[in-house]
């Protein structure tokens, strides 16, 4: 059995330390007020039982709370008073050096919480450690100077989650859609160097990767680009190749027919596309940003976004090459082909690629094969998105999410045209719906009252996020605000006008709708009797955002929070506050957003149809998924799922498993086992290897694919996922 020290290090539980601390306090009071030795042992026994039953490693503060409760329950109030005073004095001493222990533990690589915090960061790498060090300082400044005490308290108790405090000290935003078209067509500046319009597709791809890296270093959330912005440069290369080929033919005196000429040109164009796509794939996964990780970038593939038929045909060539290269994968250090985490791919299902016999159906088949092997692309239904994203003129719009799932709301620029690229999200605060339910004791009236109170708490926290960005000068991130990624502001100009009137969004996140409904109704939200309550909760969130937006002209929107590592924190806080409640707080995780619980048996088609109603009520972003077995030999079934997505839900993804053991060469599913301390570990089913450094494991955790492992809460959630097909 293990516990988590204040530094985050995981150590073996030692009952002697607890009994010694109690005896020290006990020895300082009058004999008549002292605990008996048998009482001390009983208190320690009870604590040990509580640690075993908790299902996760308790931290030192939890243990000390149990000690206080145990002493009080035995009526030794004088002893308790001394113990509490001792604890308080040490707390004051620690406040003098608020970050030292955390920073030292992550540098010494024994901080268990940091090791499992981010499934795309390797905490043993010095560049990642530098980012974590800066993050600890930022969190400390945020807590002590930037947040109200009650918001800090609510965050600590898992009532809300104030996201990305490790970057909040700086004036940084969350995620965005990069206006690659403006930067490539009109030129940009990167690190003080003027970059003109590229003269070939491969050069455009190379510049795009430099832009991606620069943007990633100036924000903490994900970014998205569209291949449509690269497509015009295919024809730029084509014309250049035609001129070169013509000169070569003239110089050699060869007799070439027009068909042969066209063939020669198109082969060279395809080679150019292959090189350009390869540049993006390998640059993205090998680049290291100032965040200590590869850029969190999404590549959008949408045929109907093209401006003309030539551009659409060229875009199809690029999409085909992207899918072929991702299907192949990338090699790990052992030379085995594996699934890369980035870039995330999104493929739009539309009327000319979803029906058999349609012009681009072959691309959808290739996408299906790629998903079956590599878990991407994910899918957006143009049909459903046009129904849901209606602008002020009454027109539907189709556009990418920012990163993994955060969606902008429809917006028309000053000329009355829809605008999406160049817009961004200001940040997220998430409400723990499970805590609202448990705090109400099951009383509907009290639930509604508490929900409104907690929403107002989130509102205040979101205002703090918004106000942190107010007054930010464009000089803070020239690539974003001055050189086209998001805007073309002047030097020294503030970004304030981009924070209002719908240009950017700010997100009210929510988590645990499933457990919230189960506590309040005794049933899953998939049950027809419980579903109306679940929908009413979602409507209440949207009504709050609408009210705030109308009053402040800030675009608040409801967001289905992915909770990568926070799921574990919320679960631990719920157990501490309410104990273990079957079906509600009995796991080390809570369910993401509106999702059906991972253990509930439901088929893929029913799950997607059911969740589509809730996705509609998460306009600020959400994604649904289905868990499927190895589908590489059943592509028709994947195609059936894609058609169902097209007709029923705006945004969805398929989760498969594609792992590799470097010790024995096993390819398949690396499994989750339990060690002697009850801790979940990864295990090769072939050679029983437990060394995470010698396994390549890829799992979807929050819209992105994670490859650096997860905390105990998320690992339990991954283990308990049932197949939907």
Per-region residue spans from a language model:
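Short, solvent-exposed positions on alpha-helices
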Residues: 38, 57-61, 504, 528, ...
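Conserved catalytic cores of very large enzyme subunits
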Residues: 89-502, 523, 527-690, 696
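Charged, amphipathic alpha-helical regulatory modules used
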Residues: 1-110, 719-724
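Non-cofactor substrate-recognition interfaces
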Residues: 13-15, 422, 698
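Long insertion/accessory domains within large nucleic-acid-processing enzymes
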Residues: 686-725
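Contiguous, well-ordered alpha-helical segments that form the cores/surfaces of helical PPI scaffolds
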Residues: 232, 506-519, 539, 700
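Metallocofactor- and cofactor-centric catalytic cores in central/energy metabolism, strongly enriched
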Residues: 273, 281, 519, 714-719
């Amino acid at each position: 059995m293990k516990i988590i020290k204040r530094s985050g290090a995981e150590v073996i539980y030692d009952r002697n330390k607890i009994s010694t601390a109690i005896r020290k306090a006990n020895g300082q009071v009058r004999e008549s007020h002292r605990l008996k030795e048998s009482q001390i042992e009983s208190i320690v026994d009870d604590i040990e039982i509580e640690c075993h039953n908790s299902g996760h490693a308790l931290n030192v503060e939890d243990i000390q709370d149990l000690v206080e409760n145990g002493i009080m329950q035995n009526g030794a109030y004088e002893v308790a008073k001394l113990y509490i005073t001792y604890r308080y004095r040490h707390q004051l001493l620690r406040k003098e050096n608020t970050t030292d222990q955390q920073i030292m533990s992550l540098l010494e690589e024994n901080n268990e919480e940091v090791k499992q915090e981010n499934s795309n960061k390797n905490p043993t790498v010095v560049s990642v450690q530098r980012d974590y060090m800066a993050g600890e300082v930022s969190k400390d400044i945020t807590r002590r100077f930037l947040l109200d005490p009650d918001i800090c308290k609510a965050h600590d108790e898992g009532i809300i989650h104030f996201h990305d405090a490790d970057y909040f000290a700086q004036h940084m935003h969350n995620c965005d859609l990069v206006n690659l078209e403006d930067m490539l067509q009109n030129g940009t500046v990167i690190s003080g160097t003027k970059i003109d319009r590229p003269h070939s597709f491969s050069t455009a791809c190379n510049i795009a990767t430099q832009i991606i890296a620069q943007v990633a270093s100036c924000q903490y959330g994900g970014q998205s680009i569209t291949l449509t912005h690269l497509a015009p440069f295919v024809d730029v290369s084509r014309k250049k190749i035609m001129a070169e080929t013509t000169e070569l033919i003239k110089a050699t005196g060869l007799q070439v027919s027009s068909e042969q000429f066209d063939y020669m040109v198109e082969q060279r164009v395809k080679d150019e596309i292959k090189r350009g796509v390869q540049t993006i794939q390998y640059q993205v996964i090998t680049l290291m940003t100032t965040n200590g990780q590869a850029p969190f970038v999404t590549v959008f593939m949408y045929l109907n976004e093209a401006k003309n038929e030539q551009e659409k045909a060229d875009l199809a060539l690029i999409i085909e090459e992207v899918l072929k290269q991702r299907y192949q994968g990338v090699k790990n250090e052992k030379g085995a082909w594996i699934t890369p985490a980035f870039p995330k791919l999104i493929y739009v299902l539309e009327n000319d690629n979803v029906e058999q016999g349609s012009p681009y159906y072959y691309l959808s088949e290739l996408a299906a094969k790629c998903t079956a092997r590599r878990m991407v692309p994910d899918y957006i239904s143009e049909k459903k998105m046009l129904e849901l994203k209606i602008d002020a003129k009454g027109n539907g719009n189709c556009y990418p999410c920012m990163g993994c799932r955060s969606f902008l709301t429809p917006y028309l620029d000053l000329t009355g045209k829809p605008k999406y690229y160049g817009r961004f999200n200001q940040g997220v605060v998430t409400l723990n719906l499970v805590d609202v339910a448990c705090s109400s004791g099951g009383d509907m009236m009290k639930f509604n009252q508490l929900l409104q109170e907690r929403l107002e708490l989130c509102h205040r926290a979101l205002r703090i996020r918004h106000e942190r960005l107010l007054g930010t000068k464009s000089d803070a991130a020239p690539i974003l605000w001055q050189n086209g990624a998001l805007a073309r502001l002047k030097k020294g100009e503030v970004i304030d006008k981009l924070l209002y009137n719908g240009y950017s969004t700010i997100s009210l996140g929510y988590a645990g709708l499933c457990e919230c409904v189960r506590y309040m109704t005794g049933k899953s939200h998939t049950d027809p009797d419980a579903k109306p309550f679940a929908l009413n909760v979602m409507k209440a969130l949207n009504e709050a955002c609408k009210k705030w937006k109308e009053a402040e002209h800030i675009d608040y929107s409801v967001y289905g929070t992915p909770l990568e590592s926070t799921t574990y924190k919320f679960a631990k806080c719920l157990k501490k506050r309410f104990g273990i409640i079957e079906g509600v707080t009995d796991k080390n995780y809570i369910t993401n957003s509106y999702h059906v619980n991972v253990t509930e048996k439901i088929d893929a088609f029913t799950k997607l149809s059911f969740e589509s109603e809730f996705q509609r009520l998460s306009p600020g972003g959400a994604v649904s998924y289905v868990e499927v077995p190895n589908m590489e030999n059943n592509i028709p079934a994947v195609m059936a799922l894609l058609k169902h997505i097209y007709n029923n839900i705006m945004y969805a993804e398929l989760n498969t498993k594609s792992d590799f053991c470097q010790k024995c060469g096993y390819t398949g599913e690396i499994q989750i086992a339990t060690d002697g301390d009850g801790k979940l570990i990864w295990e090769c089913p072939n050679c029983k290897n437990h060394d995470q450094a010698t396994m390549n494991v890829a799992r979807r955790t929050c819209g992105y694919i994670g490859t650096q492992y997860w905390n105990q809460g998320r690992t339990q959630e991954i283990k308990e996922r049932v197949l939907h097909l």
